[in-house]
């Protein structure tokens, strides 16, 4: 678990992962300052913490396909959003991760 997740005391369960969406620029290309209501949700996020994992039919632990610190692509509307200490996070299932960005 990352230092950030440890200090927040958030531990996802099962095959869920905790991610933090990347911030969208607050200024448009033309220099116009965008209000929060005009910003769209980003589909890129950093993996902050991993859950305990999923088990197969024989009880063997299946490895996660991502690691803490990876930048992943998730659907804009997936997961459970939560705010902790003023920071916004999303808990998503591993199956909701579309890709790992290299």
UniProtKB/Swiss-Prot annotation:
Q: Where in the cell is it found?
A: Cytoplasm
UniProt xrefs under Pfam families: Cpn10
Q: Does the keyword Transit peptide apply?
A: no
Q: Which domain of life does this protein belong to?
A: Bacteria
Functional description taken from the UniProt entry:
Together with the chaperonin GroEL, plays an essential role in assisting protein folding. The GroEL-GroES system forms a nano-cage that allows encapsulation of the non-native substrate proteins and provides a physical environment optimized to promote and accelerate protein folding. GroES binds to the apical surface of the GroEL ring, thereby capping the opening of the GroEL channel.
Subunit structure, per the record? Answer: Heptamer of 7 subunits arranged in a ring. Interacts with the chaperonin GroEL.
From the Swiss-Prot or TrEMBL record, give the protein name. Co-chaperonin GroES
């Amino acid at each position: 678990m990352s230092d950030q997740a440890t200090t927040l005391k958030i531990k996802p369960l099962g095959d869920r992962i905790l991610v933090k969406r990347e911030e969208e620029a607050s200024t448009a290309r033309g220099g116009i300052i965008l209000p929060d209501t005009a910003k769209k949700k980003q589909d890129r996020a950093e993996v902050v913490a991993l859950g305990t994992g999923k088990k197969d039919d024989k009880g063997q632990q299946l490895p996660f396909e991502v690691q803490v610190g990876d930048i992943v692509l998730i659907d804009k509307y997936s997961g459970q959003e939560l705010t902790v200490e003023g920071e916004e996070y999303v808990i998503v299932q591993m199956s909701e991760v579309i890709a790992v960005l290299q």
